[in-house]
Amino acid sequence: MAEYTGGSIKADHLCVLVHGLWGNPAHMKNVARRLRAEFPEDQLYILVAKKNAGSFTYDGIELGGERVCREIEDQLEEIKSKGGNIKKLSIAGYSLGGLVARYAIGLLYSKGVLDELECQNFTAFASPFLGVRSPLRGFTNQLFNVLGARTLSKSGHQLFTIDQFRETGRPLLAVMADPKSVFMQGLARFKRRTLYTNIINDRTAVHYTTGIAKRDPYADLTKVKVNYLPGYEPVVLDPSNPVTQLPHEEVKKDFQTRARAYAANLPFVLALSVFLPMGVVAFLITSAIQTVRSSKRIELHEKGLAGIDIRTYRSVPLIIKEIRNQIEDAYEELNSRQHQDYLPASQEVSSDSDDEEDNKQPKKEQKQPTVERKPSVRRRRSSAASASHHLPTLALTAEQFEMIDGLDGLGWRKYPVWIHKVRHSHAAIVVRSDKESFSEGEVVLGHWAKEEFLI
């Protein structure tokens, strides 16, 4: 990967890549490779974060963000010491790395580092902005969401939003989506905020959380016509009109269609019934061991004995102008077996600030986008919005609905992605390893580097 990272002292733009849960820098190799193919070393300096790899990702978004922030500061200092002058900053996070990157951005903002840089791109690939809590109700909620939250140490608590972050009394992800937080203020500095979300087969982070959405128009793809982005078919959907509802007579959801689908999935179901129990046991044992190790690392970190002086990161206010008080496969398969629940019609949320706006593409880049919505301004609704009016609202928590409203207030360029060749679309979206079945991820990375990345 060394041939793709780094850069020359002539480069004035630093791009930081952050891997996900259980990940390591090698997972971002093809992301770096695609960037380097588009931008030479004298134009773009590429840093792949290294200090939060493997089981260290169990330690929580906060600790991961502090580690990445330290790496960015160290890299800026190193480049400067060699005679370089970085003027621009871009950050891209994959999976949990998107959340870790957002935390690091908040720290960089609070320390004034972003005041000295032109913030260009923030990109998230399959990042669970709303956590990984499945939209479930009743007993299933207790079984999956409550149990799952306790298998990944501090990261698990934060991803399932059962934590209380410092003295705020709120989950960290909720604080990070508060328009008055340093995390949102920092994110607002970036000229372009882009996300790529898998519409199916992402067993780690499903569409509603990676796409920041209250509804799921891709729950039954037999009922819609998928519209692709010209030049990037059949992988990247057209964000302005991703799907078109099919007339009733064209819906091919008859008995024969279901029977064929079941027959095609039968080998997978049989294999799952054999290997899943063994995988779950191994996963729980590994999680218990890693949770104990993570707790020890967290204790050392909090005492300032892990190589980072946390006082430089903990002395800044989290909220602006307001008091603060106001093994992977087993996990993925468990998550994939949970079907999304929906709110009863009587509890449907208002659609005024809903995902009607989710796929709106900004027509003009703004240097300083405002964080707070202007309630008097009614945004023009896209064709994608009208197509989702009839869809039921997912059974999210009140905090998740607030997170959606807060995050959407920033303005995003959202690209739905359909990976066809492999069930493991979460890994394929960034071509996490050199497999032919992951080749569709090259289309995603190509679109990002060519069409989205501002140099």
Locate each region found by the language model:
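Short coil/turn segments at secondary-structure boundaries
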Residues: 26-33, 58-64, 103-107, 134-140, ...
